[in-house]
Amino acid sequence: MAKTTDVRPKITMACTECKERNYITKKNRRNDPDRLDLAKFCPRCGKKTTHRETR
């Protein structure tokens, strides 16, 4: 089982327009303590949209 204080936890990225969770990635908590916002392609919207980290 993963530690609760893992430095590189798995996070889920959700589209800000349609709210679909499309991507799973890892991030470094020490370098990026805030939520990530990345421009990614959303297959449901069919265009490049902002994806935000979900909890």
Swiss-Prot record:
One of its GO terms (cellular component) is cytoplasm. The keyword Cytoplasm does not apply. Keywords: Ribonucleoprotein, Ribosomal protein. GO terms for molecular function: structural constituent of ribosome. GO terms for biological process: translation. The keyword Ribonucleoprotein applies. InterPro entries: Ribosomal_bL33, Ribosomal_bL33_sf, Ribosomal_zn-bd. SUPFAM superfamilies: Zn-binding ribosomal proteins (SSF57829). NCBIfam families: PRK00504.1, PRK00595.1, rpmG_bact. Belongs to the bacterial ribosomal protein bL33 family. This is Large ribosomal subunit protein bL33C. It comes from Kineococcus radiotolerans (strain ATCC BAA-149 / DSM 14245 / SRS30216). The lineage of its organism: Bacteria, Bacillati, Actinomycetota, Actinomycetes, Kineosporiales. The gene is rpmG3.
